[in-house]
């Protein structure tokens, strides 16, 4: 089965990101495909490379990045939600006069059209969070 995932919550204030990660990992290990992972609303906070959790806590951003590396996942961050929360790549930093970027290199910023395409291409769109 081909899945698309939508994550609407940040990495440390809600269990949605952890649940989505565990779902994705289990699905991929069982041979299913994930067409795209789309981070929306507060879920865009899963993409910042500046997250630094305590050593005894899980690093959900790195977990997502490692899963993306292992399975060549398309990890898309909503541009509007990212801008509102200060998540920028080089293009957005340049367009908005920012002097730094903070998106993890395994993620990319794009628009809601990517979510629509994922919903069309996948057999199921699974949404995590409110």
From Swiss-Prot:
InterPro entries found in the cross-reference section: DsrEFH-like (IPR027396), Sulphur_relay_DsrE/F-like (IPR003787), Sulphur_relay_TusD/DsrE (IPR017463)
Native species: Allochromatium vinosum (strain ATCC 17899 / DSM 180 / NBRC 103801 / NCIMB 10441 / D)
Active site per database record: 78 (cysteine persulfide intermediate)
Sample GO molecular function, one term: sulfurtransferase activity
Protein family membership: Belongs to the DsrE/TusD family.
Gene expressing this chain: dsrE
GO BP term (any one): tRNA wobble position uridine thiolation
Entry's localization field: Cytoplasm
Alphabetized UniProt keyword annotations: Cytoplasm, Transferase
PANTHER family documented for this protein: PROTEIN YCHN (PTHR34874), SULFURTRANSFERASE TUSD (PTHR34874:SF3)
Source organism superkingdom: Bacteria
Function according to Swiss-Prot or TrEMBL: Not known. Could be involved in the oxidation of intracellular sulfur.
EC number: 2.8.1.-
Protein name in UniProt: Putative sulfurtransferase DsrE
GO cellular component, one term: sulfurtransferase complex
NCBIfam families noted in UniProt: PRK00207.1, sulf_tusD_dsrE
């Amino acid at each position: 089965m081909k899945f698309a995932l939508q994550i609407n919550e940040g990495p440390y204030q809600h269990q949605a990101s952890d649940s989505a990660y565990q779902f994705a990992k289990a699905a991929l290990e069982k041979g299913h495909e994930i067409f795209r992972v789309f981070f929306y609303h507060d879920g865009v906070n899963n993409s910042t490379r500046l997250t630094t959790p305590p050593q005894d806590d899980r690093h959900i951003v790195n977990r997502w990045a490692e899963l993306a590396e292992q399975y060549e996942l398309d990890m898309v961050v909503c541009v509007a939600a990212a801008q509102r929360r200060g998540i920028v790549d080089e293009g957005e930093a340049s367009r908005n006069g920012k002097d730094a970027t903070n998106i993890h290199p395994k993620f990319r910023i794009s628009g809601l059209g990517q979510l629509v395409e994922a919903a069309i291409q996948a057999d199921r769109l699974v949404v995590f969070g409110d």
